[in-house]
Design a protein with these regions (language model features):
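Conserved substrate/cofactor phosphate-moiety recognition/catalytic segment
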Residues: 1-36
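Short, hinge-like loop/turn segments at secondary-structure boundaries
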Residues: 15-18, 60-62, 83-87
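Conserved phosphate-donor/acceptor-positioning beta-strand/loop module used by diverse small-molecule
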Residues: 42-44, 48, 60-80, 114
Length: 134
């Protein structure tokens, strides 16, 4: 989880494009080490730039990396906002917020697209089915 990683391994990083790239790179490298040890790894991370996601994917053989795009409009994210981040961004207190103050580049061809506007249980079931098929 991105929040967990940013309190430890990546606590020295901010939210500039360069720091975001380094955040994704470090998480991918650790994930690769874990995968090489036989662990099945799930990474929940905001990765706004395609090039960073492509770099992460390049560390793995194709069958080991599954890109899941949770396609959720910013207004829905703002409504759900459990941490109050979108409210802070709207007030101008969080200028680097992905999708608000910084761009998000959607994946070109993700392995799975989950609609964030739909039923959460149905989305979870689609994710589990995709994992079991992989």
């Amino acid at each position: 989880d991105g929040d967990n990683v940013r309190t430890g391994l990546n606590k020295d990083l901010g939210f500039t494009p360069e720091d975001r790239a380094e955040n994704v790179r470090r998480v991918a490298e650790v994930s690769k080490l874990m995968r090489d040890s036989g662990v099945v790894v799930f990474v929940a991370l905001v990765s706004p730039y395609r090039s960073d996601r492509e770099t992460a994917a390049s560390l793995f053989v194709e069958s080991e990396f599954v890109e899941v795009f949770v396609d959720t409009p910013v207004d829905i994210c703002s409504e759900r906002d459990p941490k109050g981040l979108y409210a802070k961004a709207a007030a101008g207190n969080l200028p680097n917020m992905t999708g608000v103050g910084q761009i998000y580049e959607p994946p070109v061809s993700p392995d799975l697209i989950l609609r964030g506007t739909g039923d959460l249980e149905a989305s979870a079931n689609l994710l589990v089915a995709a994992i079991l098929e992989a």
